Amino acid sequence: MRSDYRVYRYEHLEAPVVTAGSAAVLIGAQNGLFPDMGYTVSGEMGGLWAGERKVCDGFFFAIDDVPLTQADACEIHPALTAFHYRMQKEQLHVVRSQFIPDGVGGCVIELTIENLRPAPRMVEVSYTVRTDIMTVAAAHGEDGMELGRDVGEYDEKEQAFFARD
């Protein structure tokens, strides 16, 4: 069922926002960042969770080496969350949309970049993910496992990033 219902937020964007599917949840702030937050496990609630496993603390984009820091607006739909960035100096409007398909332990992220200059141009987009693989039990120190440093690599053939603890 398609819904045209949406909420736009322009103030108090430090408030939490959740993008959820049946197998994963992405928790961050309405400004598009992933601050340390959480009560059950202090400072560890934010990020991407797939079931009981925390996959990452957050992710970040940059356009032509200019980071997308705090969004100017948050657009909340029943099935997705979008963050609007006005890059005045670069004359760009960027929208980062994210949703979690049901049954998938991951997140789909889409960037829409609107060029506000009269002439066409190319931009370079970079993506950074901060992994923090753990279980809730491990974060509490209840499963006897020691939290280690995550190791990640990009597989060119699969065109995918893989990480492990």
Predicted feature locations:
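Terminal accessory carbohydrate-recognition/targeting modules of carbohydrate-active enzymes
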Residues: 1-165
